[in-house]
């Protein structure tokens, strides 16, 4: 239909006369003869292959009643030409385009109602006048032709049968399509054509749409012959269309151009299977296209206009009398190639009179547009231009053709299915096989580079008619990148020279080309060589490999740069598996580590999931600040401590030669992180080595020495030498230093030991010069060790829930003033050195002198202490601390016989050449010394430094803390005290007294003066718990070794006496108890974080009654009568100790004061209830608990009975106490 429809198809004919009249049916049957289109002999369901049952198929839809059909036929015959033309228009209703041609497609549907028929007839009468007279004349002529062409005898059969057959053939558009077409259409007309269609056509379309048996016509063609309507202007077309029912494969409709293309009469295909006209070899291809096309149509909707597939088949030509005469049987059947375009459509559902709806799936229609394929050549040996179309042929490595373009059919004469599966070697000319071998060699070489193509020499290719064409080919190939094997070769061919025989579709001659056997064997060998060559592995050229390696190296380099940019952060992260549950200790250890006093919050990226790194602890920052301060790392002379005049109430330390951090003020220069403790306070664990005293001990391998003492106290010193302590007690003292410290204690006497410092002693070994390389080395070792410990701690999840408070406490441990700041929760040091050393009073004859730890300084000075004689008679201990000049600063504490007295004092060498020592003993009440040294806190801390205030020394809690987010570490700065009279067994109270780092010893007589408070100042390293968590009385602070605000009571002239009366649980921290006892003496002991190293006491006249403010539930406050003897199993109140007490104190039970410590001074009460007594409330921030979580576990944990219950009163307003403390 591309070339124009026949003029015969432009006539309009009455629907009733053409499609449904007896003459139409008879003429159709007569023309088809004995074909399957004869209505009576149809093989389809029902009669004539279209109807017979109210089926679900498009070709067999129910028809209207024969009576209605017959009446409609008669009426329409009487109406006239105009009515017939209008009805013809109704058949050609819906128009859609298909390959640019107009073709009618039936939409068989259910039978129409009588009302629909009447409505259609009325519209026919109304609009029939609109059509021209020539249309009516042509309609009448067409009717006459059909009546004459058919045999009337067929129409004279039984009228009922004929009418029945005609009624059943209602939806058959084939007779209509042969002779009935609207005048405006060049081919099959349809709605929407611009030429010759008036408004009445649309109305007729609507009429037909409303009626049954609707047909859908195709749009797109016919413009050439539009509006002609003249029979003489008929133009032959070279394509045709047909509609096939997908239910049974029967042809429902064909365009009239089938006569011009294949020679068949107009209705000969109707009722016959389409596949009968397809060549046998192409039927499989046709069937495969049908089966693949149907799912596409169903998936795209009911009317998939674009669901088109194209393929090529050979269709049979008609053997008619005109073409071949009467010798039909003797002539061979001829086939012609056609390109078929398949489109799947669905007929719409229509309502039946019985309300039966036809489903969509059963109304599937196949519209086929067949276009003949002509040869590309017009003259023999035609030289084609460069613009001639190309076609592609693809074959595998074995030479088997796998794909052929449909464009190759007109050039080669083969259909694609004819070539697929055959060897391409069979089509090469035998003389060109050598050329083809070279071509395939090049193909293999080019295959080394993906996408490479090349053009080969022209070669000859065999075509369908037995001739050869000369092809120019551009070759490309695909190589499997994994196996490096050739997958397929694609050739884009262009015909350079045509064949000798122009018609490429002619049959090839039966005679074969005569080739000698030698040539045949040679050709066979070449073909085998080509196939073998194609089967080889494609190797990569060296340059290609180099290029790829270079590209990969560049990509790797860029990737590594990006990676290094990401990893170049300062923090060191350790990737550990995510743990769903973190223990309280692990979580809070990281939390508290993040709020280190010197931590930078703005650049901290660590979280509870990120393991803490050593760099995040600002260790390197401290080192950098240390070197930026340009410290004196060479040995320098320490100032003699005797240059400072003693204060009347205590000792005063000489000022350091330069500003010192609070880390450095506790000791003159203890630098070894191997011992983790210093002589200044043997119960404080070193956490980070940031002192300016250099490295020694375990950290740098400078060696550590241990000195054993016989006192009950333990003295530790750090340095590079060895320290020895001698005594008669059972205590041990460990110390390292360049000098030797000796502590002598005697069992007799309970007096207080006065610490004195003097030059002399053994000559100091030259200390190791502190260098940055040593510190860096130490930094690396500590970082590795810390990460290892952190990995181990992360693995413990189950047991740690019980010990969470204990682990939290470890975060706050402090090893002494000789070391720097380190986040406590990192679990870096979990050895014995990190365990708190708790001392309990000993009330038996074991009144030993203290063991002194050695004093030699590392770098700028050593720390040596005579130790602390904590319990027993106040023996005298001497600690010799070596000075950088080789001199030794000796501190000695002499204990006076009596109750539990502490022995030797502690000698400490100050940093930067400042030499002083601290000596303090616990026995006996004495005046508490005050230290008014101007301490240069470095660096300044956010919590301000409270100026020294001379008042009664008390430990008071602070309820309003200014820095809410900071939890600094403890720094213990002890002060020596000179007891003047024998005392009872000292009671260790944990008060971190903040005084000067180094205090020269004073005379014992100076301690007898009026009580003066030791000025308490905020230190940058002091751990001040958050006041919002809970309020703690100073008595509780004594038990917890925590200073909420280490300031004296400014308004109290008398020292507060701590009663031994725990009233209520600690949870009632918002209430305070004032207990006044008329005791003659009040014992004040400066406490360490864990225990007291150099305890001191404040002697008070018995006439002075001191009121002690204690917290309910705190067993630290003990009345003065109870201080005479410590009850059985009652450890000294400390952070690590339990608040347990057996019966109230009895004065004759000194031997029951047992020390629950091991040989190293490590308390076995670490896992006791005192962990949770303070920190459970600190962490959980619950103020409603009745008692600490763990205090109920041990039956010994009972509240101490007070001797002065009646004198106690509850203070309901703790704010008054806060005013006494000051806001800090």
From Swiss-Prot:
Mutations in the PAS domain result in longer circadian rhythms and courtship song (PERL mutation) or makes the flies arrhythmic (PER01 mutation). A motif (Nuclear localization signal) lies at residues 66-79. Residues 1-175, 632-764, 788-807, 874-927, 978-1008, 1094-1224 are annotated as: Disordered. Expressed in neural tissues and in several nonneural tissues of the abdomen. Malpighian tubules contain a circadian pacemaker that functions independently of the brain. Expression oscillates in all tissues studied except for the ovary. PER-A isoforms are mainly expressed in adult's head. It comes from Drosophila melanogaster. GO terms for cellular component: cell body; cytoplasm; cytosol; nucleoplasm; nucleus; perinuclear region of cytoplasm. Forms a heterodimer with timeless (TIM); the complex then translocates into the nucleus. A proportion of the protein exists as homodimer. Residues 238-373, 391-497 form the PAS domain. This is Period circadian protein. InterPro entries: PAS, PAS-like_dom_sf, PAS_fold, Period_circadian_regulator. Phosphorylated with a circadian rhythmicity, probably by the double-time protein (dbt). Phosphorylation could be implicated in the stability of per monomer and in the formation of heterodimer per-tim. Keywords: Biological rhythms, Cytoplasm, Nucleus, Phosphoprotein, Repeat. Gene3D superfamilies: PAS domain, Single helix bin. Residues 694-754 are annotated as: 30 X 2 AA approximate tandem repeats of G-[TN]. Induction: Expression is sensitive to temperature but not to light. GO terms for biological process: behavioral response to cocaine; circadian behavior; circadian regulation of gene expression; circadian rhythm; circadian sleep/wake cycle; circadian temperature homeostasis; copulation; courtship behavior. It comes from the Eukaryota.
């Amino acid at each position: 239909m591309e070339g124009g429809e026949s003029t015969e198809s432009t006539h309009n004919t009455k629907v009733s006369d053409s499609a449904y009249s007896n003459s139409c049916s008879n003429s159709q049957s007569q023309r088809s003869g004995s074909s399957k289109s004869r209505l009576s002999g149809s093989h389809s369901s029902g009669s004539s292959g279209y109807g017979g049952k109210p089926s679900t198929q498009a070709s067999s839809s129910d028809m209207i009643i024969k009576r209605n059909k017959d009446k409609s036929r008669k009426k329409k015959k009487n109406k006239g030409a105009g009515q017939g033309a209008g009805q013809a228009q109704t058949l050609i209703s819906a128009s859609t385009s298909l390959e640019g041609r107009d073709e009618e497609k039936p939409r068989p549907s259910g039978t129409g109602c009588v009302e629909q028929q009447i409505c259609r007839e009325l519209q026919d009468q109304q609009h029939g006048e609109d059509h021209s007279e020539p249309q009516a004349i042509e309609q009448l002529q067409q009717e006459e032709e059909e009546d004459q062409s058919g045999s009337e005898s067929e129409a004279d059969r039984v009228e009922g049968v004929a009418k029945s057959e005609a009624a059943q053939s209602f939806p058959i558009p084939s007779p209509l399509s042969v002779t009935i077409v609207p005048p405006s259409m060049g081919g099959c007309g349809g709605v929407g054509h611009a030429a010759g269609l008036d408004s009445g056509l649309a109305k007729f379309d609507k009429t037909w749409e409303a009626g049954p048996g609707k047909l859908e016509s195709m749009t797109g063609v016919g413009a050439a012959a539009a509006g002609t309507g003249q029979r003489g202007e008929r133009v032959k077309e070279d394509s045709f269309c047909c509609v096939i029912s997908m239910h049974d494969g029967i042809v429902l409709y064909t365009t009239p151009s089938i006569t011009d293309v294949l020679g068949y009469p107009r209705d000969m295909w109707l009722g016959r299977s389409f596949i009968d006209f397809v060549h046998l070899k192409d039927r499989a291809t046709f069937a495969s296209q049908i089966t693949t096309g149907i799912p596409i149509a169903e998936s795209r909707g009911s009317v998939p206009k674009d669901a088109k597939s194209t393929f090529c088949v050979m269709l049979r030509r008609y053997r008619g009398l005109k073409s071949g005469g009467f010798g039909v049987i003797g002539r061979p059947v001829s086939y012609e190639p056609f390109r078929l375009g398949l489109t799947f459509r669905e007929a719409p559902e229509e309502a039946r009179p019985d309300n039966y709806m036809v489903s969509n799936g059963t109304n599937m229609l196949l519209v086929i547009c067949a276009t003949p394929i002509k040869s590309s050549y017009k003259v023999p040996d035609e030289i084609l231009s460069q613009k001639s179309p190309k076609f592609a042929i693809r074959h595998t490595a074995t030479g088997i053709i796998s794909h052929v373009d449909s464009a190759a059919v007109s050039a080669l004469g083969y259909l694609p299915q004819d070539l697929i599966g055959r060897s391409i070697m069979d089509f090469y000319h035998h003389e060109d096989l050598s050329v083809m071998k070279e071509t395939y060699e090049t193909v293999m070489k080019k295959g080394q580079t993906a996408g490479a193509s090349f053009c080969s020499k022209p070669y000859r290719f065999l075509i369908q008619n037995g001739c050869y064409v000369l092809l120019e080919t551009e070759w490309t190939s695909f190589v499997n990148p994994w196996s490096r094997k050739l997958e397929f070769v694609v050739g884009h061919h262009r015909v350079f020279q045509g064949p000798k025989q122009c018609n490429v579709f002619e049959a090839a001659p039966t005679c074969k080309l005569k080739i000698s056997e030698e040539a045949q064997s040679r050709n066979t060998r070449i073909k085998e060589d080509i196939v073998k060559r194609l089967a080889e592995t494609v190797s990569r050229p060296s340059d290609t490999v180099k290029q790829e390696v270079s590209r990969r190296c560049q990509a790797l380099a860029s990737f590594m740069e990006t990676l290094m940019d990401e990893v170049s952060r300062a923090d060191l992260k350790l990737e550990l598996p995510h743990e769903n549950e973190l223990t309280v200790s692990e979580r809070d250890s990281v939390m508290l580590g993040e709020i280190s006093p010197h931590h930078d919050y703005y650049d901290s990226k660590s979280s509870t999931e990120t393991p803490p790194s050593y760099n995040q602890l600002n260790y390197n920052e401290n080192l950098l600040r240390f070197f930026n301060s340009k410290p004196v790392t060479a040995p320098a002379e320490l100032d003699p401590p005797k240059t400072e005049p003693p204060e009347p109430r205590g000792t005063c330390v000489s000022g350091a030669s330069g500003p010192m951090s609070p880390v450095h003020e506790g000791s003159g220069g203890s630098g070894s992180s191997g011992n983790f403790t210093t002589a200044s306070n043997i119960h404080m664990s070193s956490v980070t080595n940031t002192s300016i005293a250099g490295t020694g001990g375990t950290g740098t391998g400078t060696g550590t020495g241990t000195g054993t003492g016989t006192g009950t106290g333990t003295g530790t010193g750090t340095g590079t030498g060895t320290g020895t302590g001698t005594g008669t007690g059972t205590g041990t003292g460990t110390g390292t230093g360049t000098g030797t410290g000796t502590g002598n204690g005697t069992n007799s006497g309970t007096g207080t030991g006065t610490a004195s410092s003097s030059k002399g002693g053994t000559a100091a070994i030259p200390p190791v010069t502190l260098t940055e390389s040593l510190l860096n080395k130490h930094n690396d070792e500590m970082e590795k060790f810390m990460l290892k410990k952190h990995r181990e701690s992360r693995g413990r999840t189950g047991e740690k829930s019980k010990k969470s408070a204990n682990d939290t406490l470890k975060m706050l441990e402090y090893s002494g003033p000789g070391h720097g700041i380190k986040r406590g929760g990192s679990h870096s040091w979990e050895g014995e050195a990190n365990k708190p050393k708790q001392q309990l009073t000993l009330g038996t004859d074991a009144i030993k002198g203290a063991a002194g730890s050695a004093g030699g300084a590392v770098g700028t000075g050593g720390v040596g202490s005579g130790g602390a004689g904590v319990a027993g008679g106040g023996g005298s201990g001497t600690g010799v601390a070596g000075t950088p000049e080789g001199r030794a600063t000796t501190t000695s504490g002499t204990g006076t016989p009596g109750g539990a007295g502490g022995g030797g004092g502690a000698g400490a060498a100050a940093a930067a050449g400042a030499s002083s020592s601290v000596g303090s003993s616990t026995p006996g009440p004495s005046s508490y010394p005050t230290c008014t040294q101007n301490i240069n806190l470095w660096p300044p801390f956010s919590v301000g430094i409270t100026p020294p205030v001379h008042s009664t020394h008390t430990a008071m809690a602070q309820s309003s803390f200014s820095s809410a987010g900071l939890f600094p570490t403890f720094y213990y700065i002890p002060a020596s005290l000179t007891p003047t009279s024998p005392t009872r067994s000292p009671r260790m109270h944990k008060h971190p007294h903040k005084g000067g780092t180094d205090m020269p010893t004073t005379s014992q007589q100076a301690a007898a003066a009026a009580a003066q408070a030791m000025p308490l100042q905020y230190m940058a390293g002091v751990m001040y718990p958050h006041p919002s968590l809970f309020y703690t009385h100073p008595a509780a602070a004594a038990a917890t070794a925590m200073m909420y605000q280490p300031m004296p009571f400014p308004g109290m002239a008398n020292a507060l006496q701590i009663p031994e009366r725990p009233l209520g649980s600690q949870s009632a921290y918002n209430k305070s108890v004032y207990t006044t006892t008329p005791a003659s003496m009040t014992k004040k002991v400066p406490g360490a974080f864990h225990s007291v190293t150099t305890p001191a006491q404040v002697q008070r006249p018995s006439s002075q009654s001191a009121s002690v403010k204690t917290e309910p539930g705190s067993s630290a406050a003990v009345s003065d009568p109870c201080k005479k003897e410590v009850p059985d199993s009652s450890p000294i109140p400390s952070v690590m100790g339990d608040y347990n007490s057996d019966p109230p104190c009895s004065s004759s039970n000194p031997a029951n004061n047992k020390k629950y410590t091991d040989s190293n001074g490590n308390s076995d009460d670490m896992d006791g209830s005192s962990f949770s007594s303070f920190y459970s409330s600190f962490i959980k921030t619950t103020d409603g608990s009745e008692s600490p979580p763990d205090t109920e576990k041990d039956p010994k944990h009972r509240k101490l009975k007070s001797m002065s219950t009646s004198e106690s009163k509850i203070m309901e307003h703790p704010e008054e106490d806060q005013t006494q403390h000051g806001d800090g």
